[in-house]
């Protein structure tokens, strides 16, 4: 024999889940115990409706008088209608009737009627009275004792087998219940059998039911299986739970109940309590009121209309017509007695529910769902087993407004008839649907291969765009959110479309994954708003948030610029605390030389500022602190004092003061403060990270040069930030000046390193990356390397001093601007002129002859002009290399690639031009 199992009960299932043999007795006992509520919970009786007590009283009065008569009538009818062949099959080899046989639908029949041969005490112990049957009752049935023969296929409803009585004609509104509830109560493979059984029982059971009612026959225990007046006793629940757990079944519904609580109306143990279907409340009524429209499903809809298949392969989702949220809420639902599910219930439906492993590897929250609108009604307190309750997220108007501003288009225009969700059959259902249209069919390319434009949204089977679904509906309907679309070649073939294992109604959403196109870099963004560059919308504006944050390079002046402590005022030209003020005075005036024990990059903060005096002093110079700033302040006070005493007579003391002042100013001019700042902020040595143990190759050398350029660019930004007057420029002008002049600055600094380190015989890019003749040829930029080496040799021929180099390098920063000008062009011109004057002052400091000073100024400015053509050639070379980088396997760091792709084309096209001192 075989017994079909469900979640904690006996009901028809597909033949894959069967247990044979020894479990028959255990299941028979479990079923009888479940049917006996027991009188142990008096509070459960008080929780039942008033109609339940009246029904129980009538059944108790009629049970003792007419139980015997009913069983005799059933035996007579069975003997009259049973054919001789069936009687022969029912007899065993020893002549005794078989204890069990197959029912009309092929399911096992488990008889539960009391035998006439049993004593009267056994008959009085009925499940409706709350007493527990004797343990030997179930055992006797399995040992071949005489038992009641089941009814033939065309018998009335009272003699139906107990397994079918759970889902057969006694279950109200089976044909009109929602598709989700149908999948819970009976799988897709057994739904047709139950519907046929229901149609037969409706036609045949009406006459027998009227005859039984006229004769006063009570309803049997099978008819009232769902109509108990009390909850399950503790023993029954514990026994059912133990058996279910031992067999791998889930009884989550029982775990949520405490003694005395009522179960949900759609639960398998919930009592209907004899209330007519017409007066039962409709759980989906609040949903219909919330949506503002009623679904026009009629109560007399046939089973074929309500069991329509959606376009999903295999028919996994049935009866979705008019149920955009898994709810069959209609105006006539109350009168038809339909058992409905609230909108917040969402099923984990699978095409392979028999495999337990199907649930273990699923990610139920990895689907791009979105909701914008009023939230559904709150979930009920106790969910059914296999139904998961989720509280939907309400993004409200803020989410709707944000979605409307999405770069993929206005979402308000996407709410059409095709956006009502899968299988929305009526126009009212489509209008009242809450399926969000954030991801349209044309945007499927962002999340996977698009399945074409097939999809119909019309009719009862519209499944969405790209699904090849049935029904010629609106083009471009919204595709279901939870599945992968078929390949391009299989877009129109429904047989090749694999339906999702899990379908989510609109009431479930966990997170909304936003699209991340691969063309947009994840770490970098644009710097400029005026030029989109060859990559479309990709700009470099947000690059400062990752690599060059403007807040980092230009912090607010509220704390000490050296250690970050609270600043006490402006000391020696910078906003510092008292401790750093005293330290700088002693360190700058003293003759002690500080050396860093590390790599000149020690952290200087409030707690570690005394660890490394060398790095602290260097940071003071970078902040602009100089001893001359204090002297200039004194000179300013002295000048004001002289103006106040202009009316007084001249005295010998005043003449002496004027002589000291003039000599002091002349001495100050020969030792400019500007040089002290430039020496302090000059960047240190930067390594390229090149592996010199590997053989030289074009890709390796150029990749190392690009990496070195990225590292040096960061130092250039820090150096420019520390230049006097640079912070007074507009922020956009600051970033533009750095982006346009970075190549010339690096070439000029590399030429100086080559002159000081290798006497201009090689190109000293970095200590670990020095180019000789072989590497110049290997890098395929030999002509550019020759010009850079010639620039390095100019430093030796002209005998450039370190002071002249520092001033020329600072002036080179302000030597290239856009043709249209900067945002604050006037201040830029003034700042550039000040740096030119500083260069002239440095020249005049060493030379007393004006003719010699003019000649020197001419030589230095010609050297500055010679840097611009070299930088332009390197701009062209790097831009061409970036375009072919994927072909030659040359790596470009993010920041370098952004600047080369966005700013270099402006220089090459003539929108940005250098400022020359001499006519070219």
UniProtKB/Swiss-Prot annotation:
Record note on what altering residue 445 to R does: In AIS; uncertain significance
DNA-binding region as annotated in the record: 560-632
Region Interaction with LPXN, annotated ranges: 552-919
Chain residue ranges for the region called Interaction with HIPK3: 572-662
Statement: the UniProt record of this protein carries the keyword Lyase: no
ZnF NR C4-type: positions: 560-580, 596-620
Any GO molecular function: RNA polymerase II transcription regulatory region sequence-specific DNA binding
Annotated effect of mutating residue 588 to S: In prostate cancer; somatic mutation
Keywords: Activator, Cytoplasm, Disease variant, DNA-binding, Isopeptide bond, Lipid-binding, Lipoprotein, Metal-binding, Neurodegeneration, Nucleus, Palmitate, Phosphoprotein, Pseudohermaphroditism, Receptor, Steroid-binding, Transcription, Transcription regulation, Ubl conjugation, Zinc, Zinc-finger
Outcome (variant: residue 535 to F): Greatest decrease of CSK-induced phosphorylation and inhibition of transcriptional activity induced by EGF
Protein name: Androgen receptor
Organism, scientific name: Homo sapiens
């Amino acid at each position: 024999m075989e017994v079909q199992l469900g979640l904690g009960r006996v009901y028809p299932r597909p033949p894959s889940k069967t247990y044979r043999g020894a479990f028959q007795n255990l299941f028979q006992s479990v079923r009888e115990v479940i049917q006996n509520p027991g009188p142990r919970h008096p509070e459960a009786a008080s929780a039942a409706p008033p109609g339940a007590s009246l029904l129980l009283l009538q059944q108790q009065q009629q049970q003792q008088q007419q139980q015997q008569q009913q069983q005799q009538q059933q035996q007579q009818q069975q003997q009259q209608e049973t054919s001789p062949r069936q009687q022969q099959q029912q007899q065993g080899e020893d002549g005794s009737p078989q204890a069990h046989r197959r029912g009309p639908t092929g399911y096992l029949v488990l008889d539960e009627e009391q035998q006439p041969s049993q004593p009267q005490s056994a008959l009085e112990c009925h499940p409706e009275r709350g007493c527990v049957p004797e343990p030997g009752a179930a055992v006797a049935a399995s040992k071949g004792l005489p038992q009641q023969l089941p009814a033939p296929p065309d018998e009335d409803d009272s003699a139906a087998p107990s397994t079918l009585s759970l889902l057969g004609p006694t279950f109200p509104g089976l044909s009109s219940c929602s598709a989700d509830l149908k999948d819970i109560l009976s799988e897709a493979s057994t739904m047709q059998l139950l519907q046929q059984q229901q149609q037969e029982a409706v036609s045949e059971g009406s006459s027998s039911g009227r005859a039984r009612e006229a004769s006063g026959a009570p309803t049997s225990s099978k008819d009232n299986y769902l109509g108990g007046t009390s909850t399950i006793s503790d023993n029954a629940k514990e026994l059912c739970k133990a058996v279910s757990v031992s067999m791998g079944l889930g009884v989550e519904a029982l775990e949520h109940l405490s003694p005395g609580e009522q179960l949900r109306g759609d639960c398998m143990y919930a009592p209907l309590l004899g209330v007519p279907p017409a007066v039962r409340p409709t759980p989906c009524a609040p949903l219909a009121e919330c949506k503002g429209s009623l679904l026009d499903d009629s109560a007399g809809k046939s089973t074929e209309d309500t069991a329509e298949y959606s376009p999903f392969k295999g028919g996994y989702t049935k009866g979705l017509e008019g149920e955009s949220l898994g709810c069959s809420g209609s105006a006539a639902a109350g009168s038809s007695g339909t058992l409905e599910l609230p909108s917040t219930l969402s099923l984990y439906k699978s095409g392979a529910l028999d495999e337990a492993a199907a649930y273990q590897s699923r990610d139920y929250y990895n689907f791009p769902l979105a909701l914008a609108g009023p939230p559904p009604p709150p979930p009920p307190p106790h969910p059914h087993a296999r139904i998961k309750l989720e509280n939907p997220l309400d993004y409200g108007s803020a989410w709707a407004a944000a979605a409307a501003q999405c770069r993929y288009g206005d979402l308000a225009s996407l709410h059409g008839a095709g956006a009502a969700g899968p299988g929305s059959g009526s126009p009212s259902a489509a209008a009242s649907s809450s399926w969000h249209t954030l991801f349209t069919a044309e945007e499927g390319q962002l999340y996977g291969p698009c399945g074409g434009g097939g999809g119909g949204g019309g009719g009862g089977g519209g499944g969405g765009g790209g699904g090849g679904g049935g029904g010629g509906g609106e083009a471009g309907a919204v595709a279901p959110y939870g599945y992968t679309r078929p390949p391009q070649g299989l877009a129109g073939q429904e047989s090749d479309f694999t339906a999702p294992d899990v379908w989510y109604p609109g009431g479930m959403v966990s997170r909304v994954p936003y699209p991340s196109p691969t063309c947009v870099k994840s770490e970098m963004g644009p710097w400029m708003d005026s030029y989109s560059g060859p990559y479309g919308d990709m700009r470099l504006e947000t690059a400062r948030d990752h690599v060059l944050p403007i807040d980092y390079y230009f912090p607010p002046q509220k704390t000490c610029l050296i250690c970050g402590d609270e600043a006490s005022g402006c000391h020696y030209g910078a906003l510092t605390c008292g401790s750093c003020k005293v330290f700088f005075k002693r360190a700058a005036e003293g003759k002690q030389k500080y050396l860093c024990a590390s790599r000149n990059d020690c952290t200087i903060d409030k707690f570690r500022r005394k660890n490394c005096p060398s790095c602290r002093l260097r940071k003071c110079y970078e902040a602009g602190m100089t001893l001359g700033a204090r002297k200039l302040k004194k000179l300013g006070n002295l000048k004001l004092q002289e103006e106040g005493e202009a009316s007084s007579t001249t005295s010998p003391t005043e003449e002496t003061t004027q002589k000291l002042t003039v000599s002091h100013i002349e001495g100050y001019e020969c030792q400019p403060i500007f040089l002290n700042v430039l020496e302090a902020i000059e960047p240190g040595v930067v390594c390229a990270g090149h592996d010199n143990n590997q053989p030289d190759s074009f890709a390796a050398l150029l990749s190392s040069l690009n990496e070195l350029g990225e590292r040096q660019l960061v130092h250039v930004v820090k150096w420019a930030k520390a230049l006097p007057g640079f912070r007074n420029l507009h922020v956009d002008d600051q970033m533009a000046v750095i982006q346009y002049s970075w190549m010339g600055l690096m070439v000029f600094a590399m030429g100086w390193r080559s002159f000081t380190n290798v006497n201009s015989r090689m190109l000293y890019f970095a200590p670990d990356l020095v180019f000789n003749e072989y590497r110049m040829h290997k890098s395929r930029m030999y002509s550019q390397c020759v010009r850079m080496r010639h620039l390095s040799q100019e430093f030796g021929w002209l005998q450039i001093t370190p002071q002249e180099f520092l001033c020329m390098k600072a002036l080179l920063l302000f030597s290239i601007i856009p043709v249209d000008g900067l945002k604050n062009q006037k201040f830029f011109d003034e700042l550039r002129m000040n740096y030119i004057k500083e260069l002239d002052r440095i020249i005049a400091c060493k030379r007393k002859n004006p003719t010699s000073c003019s000649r020197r100024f001419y030589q230095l400015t010609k050297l500055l002009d010679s840097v611009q053509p070299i930088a332009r050639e390197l701009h062209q070379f790097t831009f061409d290399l970036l375009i072919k980088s994927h072909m030659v396997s040359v790596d470009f760091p993010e920041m370098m690639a952004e600047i080369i792709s966005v700013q270099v084309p402006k220089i090459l096209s003539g929108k940005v031009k250098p400022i020359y001192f001499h006519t070219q």
